[in-house]
């Protein structure tokens, strides 16, 4: 009930045109509530999730999402762990690794 109240009290009168959610599950739940409130997605409001969960592509309106590239993160972590295992006597220096996320554009934006 709190989400419905927020939609009616804040989103509709506030002129908000998009929402970035912390994950795809929240985006999926919010999608249902927005549609129930009579809003169109992405017409009235755009919606973007985070995680690129498989279900986000199969939602009533497939959800645009940010893929944080977990495969690359895991690959870097495994490589670093193997380096430590193979060279246990050396001093290991912290490394900064950047993995580029990807915007997966679907129907909610």
Predicted regions and their residues:
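Flexible loop/turn connectors
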Residues: 4-109
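Short beta-strand elements in bilobed, periplasmic/extracellular small-molecule ligand-binding domains
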Residues: 1
């Amino acid at each position: 009930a709190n989400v419905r109240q927020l939609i009616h009290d804040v989103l509709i009168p506030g002129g908000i045109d998009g929402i970035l959610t912390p994950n795809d599950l929240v985006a999926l739940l919010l999608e249902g509530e927005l549609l129930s409130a009579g809003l169109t997605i992405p017409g009235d409001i755009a919606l973007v999730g985070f995680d690129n969960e498989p279900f986000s592509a199969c939602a009533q309106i497939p959800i645009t999402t940010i893929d944080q590239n977990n495969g690359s993160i895991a690959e870097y972590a495994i490589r670093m762990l193997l380096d430590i295992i193979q060279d246990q006597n050396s001093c290991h220096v912290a490394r900064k690794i950047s993995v580029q996320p990807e915007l997966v554009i679907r129907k909610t934006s």
